[in-house]
Amino acid sequence: MKEVFIVATARTPIGSFNGALAGVPATQLGATVIKAALERAGIAATEVNEVYMGNVLSANLGQAPANQASLAAGVPNSVPCTTVNKVCASGMKAIMLGAQSIMLGDNDVVVAGGMENMSAAPYYLDKARTGYKLGHGNITDGIIRDGLWDPYKDYHMGNAAELCAAEYHITREDQDAYAIESYKRAAAAWEKGYFKEEVVPVQVPGKQMVTVAEDEDYKKVIFEKVPTLKPSFQKDGTITAANASNINDGAAAVVLVSGEKLKALGLKPLAKIISFADASQAPEWFTTTPVKAINNALTKAGMKISDMDYAEVNEAFSCVPIANAKDLGLPLDKVNVWGGAVAMGHPIGCSGARIVVTLNSILHQQNARYGVAGICNGGGGASAIIIEKV
């Protein structure tokens, strides 16, 4: 099979819920990173063979969101586009599908990533077509219904995360401490300019054009309040608004090329994709499925977890990286070293791609070689990918 290389990455800043990016459609956020990634790669849009973009909350976004983003980025309308919905793993699965298409010889240049504007997700009027007739009616929150709700147990993903915390004896104090460290790592990474090369500023139109160039959420934490917050999902729970990820807006993308195209165009690679894998188990245990996906990817690569210099394990909840690191035998000082979704935010269709983008940056700026990224998704699934800095 053909080798696959990452030749460029880009991500938007991550906007707060109803924050600076709330008025920018997910498709426009996607277009921003597609265009930026191609420009950074030095590849003409006419060279692109296919586009894959993850997106979860597609209601009211219009037909074929990936196609909208691709066309808005200047990619020709002759290029096929596919929107991927694997809940929180959508952006990573898009990269995996793009890589597979190159490995199999179907494509030579693919743009892949994810995009989400959770702030813009609509409410649903469930009985609007048939009529409410008489009496009170309900509206359904599209964010919760299609993004954050387990339809099997009929509860919030946070309730499932409480199972993980209990099973692994992860206390409220453990999770709060992890969350505070995530915020501190994100702040330090921004202060040191670590994200500068991956982030592309977003122009937000209005009475005056506003440029958004930095993640919003990590600056809003008040550390003294973290231990005082009430549990979010059950009265005796340990998960709070501070030690869980937030609701956010953002996009991320990578440009993938075959080894042959790399040479033909004289491109400089950033990383090589070594392997990738999915895994699944009972829906309520999605929190620990990254362990299985990462181990599957390691097995395919003929590698061990000790070969990984750094890891990105998406922080859907603080208990997720804590539990997964424990099962994998990963020291936490190798995991999410620039902070994670708890501090930076979790635009669900984007995050799988975002952690790949950040992992690549970490490998380059920390002079490391191998990294693995893993992300859980609703329904009991997870995806993982191993990359090597080139």
Give each language-model segment a name:
Residues 1-61, 65-73, 77-80, 160-172, ...:
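Conserved active-site "lid/cap" helical segment
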Residues 1-24, 139, 223-288, 292, ...:
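Condensing-enzyme catalytic core mediating Claisen C-C bond formation in acyl metabolism
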Residues 11-12, 23-31, 40, 174-264, ...:
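N-terminal extracellular/periplasmic Venus flytrap/periplasmic-binding protein-like
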Residues 55-109, 152-156, 223-246, 327-354, ...:
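Conserved catalytic cysteine-centered active-site region
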Residues 84-116, 165-194, 253-260, 325, ...:
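Active-site-proximal alpha-helical scaffold in enzymes
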Residues 109-163:
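Flexible glycine-/small-residue-enriched beta->alpha junction loops
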Residues 160-162, 195-198, 274-343:
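Active-site pocket-lining segment
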